[in-house]
């Protein structure tokens, strides 16, 4: 009897031990499943609909200016990188390690962050080692696959991939909408296309001096009449280069959350001898800045022209319609004056002076028409002095 009792107890012991071992195995598997990184650890997401804007990245690279305001208040990192992902902190002071694989536009980039509060979702902008030359030379939008790997603490990394559209350097980001459809104006990026240090500027100024309208460029030193002569010398020089007017080139970007405007760089404008209202305004602004006359880019719905201060106190603001540089029909601007018929028999110099005066008159009329909207920062308007303060925020893209 005692023998059988021992056998029974022995079997019971092994059953209990097996049950314990089984529970331990199940618990370990469950712990592994629930503790390992999951596919929803983070989500690659951005506010620009999967678009990257080289002009915005390049123009703020050395200034650190934050023009773009992320839609999430809880963001970490440099938002101007435009690349981002969302992640919820599993615990307080959560450390994460981020690696972004290399692409033609940036090198492999590594960064570390601390997520302060548990259960709070953060928008994280990794550090990016940009290839600025590749960005500046990107002439058309191209797709690029961006691979981001995130490790939480000592856990294994989770990798996600998203395809972005790297826009042309000629696309200027002018605004975007957040999730609540609030619009954020980023028109300051137009300043990136004003390039007073372009290598061709000296040659253009020499051509303007060769017109003998002025002997030298002195900026604001000799009064307003001399300022007007200097501006006209630039005007006459550009007209002699036979620029032609081309209609406004809207971006091919199709989006209801991000908006851009195509702008020719100074290189492009000089090479093609074609300008629209935006191209002409940034071209003239580049030349004005080069001779120490402060220009102002003025945008109204569907149009842009350039202004400039003719005095040191910035009390006298003048305006110029740059599209009249090209071979245009003056009757389109002043239909009641029949100017085209009056132009017959006039020399190039006489026609240049006529169009210059009319370009000032037309732009002044347009400014007064939209003055209240411009000063009130109404929709699709912009008043952007290309001043030292603006240059401290936005640098030229260098083309």
Language-model features, listed with the residues they occupy:
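N-terminal Lys/Arg-rich, disordered targeting/topogenic segments
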Residues: 1-12
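Alpha-helical and coiled-coil interaction segments, frequently adjacent to or embedded
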Residues: 83-89, 93-108, 161-165, 181, ...
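Hydrophobic/aromatic-rich core segments of domains that either
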Residues: 278-366, 370
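Beta-strand-enriched, solvent-exposed domains that form extended recognition/catalytic surfaces
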Residues: 36-175
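Secondary-structure boundary elements
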Residues: 189-272, 314
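Extracytoplasmic/secretory-pathway proteins
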Residues: 170-201, 221-228, 327-330, 336, ...
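Hydrophobic membrane-insertion alpha-helices, especially the h-region
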Residues: 15-31
């Amino acid at each position: 009897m005692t023998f059988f009792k021992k056998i029974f107890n022995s079997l019971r012991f092994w059953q209990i031990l097996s049950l314990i071992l089984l529970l331990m195995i199940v618990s370990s598997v469950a712990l592994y499943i629930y503790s390992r990184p999951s596919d929803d650890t983070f989500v690659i997401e951005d506010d620009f609909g999967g678009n990257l804007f080289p002009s915005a990245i390049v123009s703020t690279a050395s200034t650190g200016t934050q023009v773009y305001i992320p839609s999430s208040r809880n963001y970490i990192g440099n938002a101007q990188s435009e690349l981002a992902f969302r992640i919820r902190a599993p615990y307080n002071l959560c450390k994460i390690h981020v690696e972004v694989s290399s692409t033609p536009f940036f090198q492999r980039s590594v960064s570390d962050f601390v997520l302060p509060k548990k259960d709070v979702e953060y928008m994280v902008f990794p550090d990016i080692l940009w290839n600025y030359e590749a960005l500046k030379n990107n002439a058309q939008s191209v797709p690029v696959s961006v691979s981001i790997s995130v490790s939480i603490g000592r856990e294994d990394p989770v990798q996600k991939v998203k395809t972005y559209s790297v826009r042309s350097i000629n696309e200027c980001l002018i605004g975007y909408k957040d999730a609540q459809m609030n619009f954020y104006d980023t028109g300051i990026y137009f300043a990136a296309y004003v390039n007073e240090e372009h290598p061709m500027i000296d040659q253009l100024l020499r051509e303007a001096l060769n017109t003998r309208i002025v002997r030298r460029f002195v900026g604001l030193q000799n009064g307003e009449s001399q300022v007007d002569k200097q501006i006209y010398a630039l005007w006459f020089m550009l007209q002699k280069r036979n620029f032609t007017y081309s209609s406004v080139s809207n971006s091919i970007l199709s989006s209801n959350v991000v908006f851009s405007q195509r702008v020719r760089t100074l290189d492009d404008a000089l090479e093609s001898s074609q300008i629209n209202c935006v191209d002409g305004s940034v071209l003239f602004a580049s030349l004005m800045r080069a001779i120490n006359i402060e220009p102002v880019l003025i945008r109204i719905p569907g149009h842009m022209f350039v202004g400039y201060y003719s005095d040191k106190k910035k009390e006298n603001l003048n305006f110029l319609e740059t599209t009249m540089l090209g071979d245009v029909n003056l009757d389109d601007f002043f239909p009641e004056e029949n100017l085209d018929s009056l132009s017959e028999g006039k020399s190039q110099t006489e026609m240049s002076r006529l169009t210059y005066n009319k370009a000032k008159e037309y732009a002044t009329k347009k400014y007064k028409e939209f003055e209240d909207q411009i000063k009130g920062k109404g929709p699709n308007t912009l008043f952007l002095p290309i001043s030292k303060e603006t240059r401290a925020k936005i640098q030229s893209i260098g083309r």
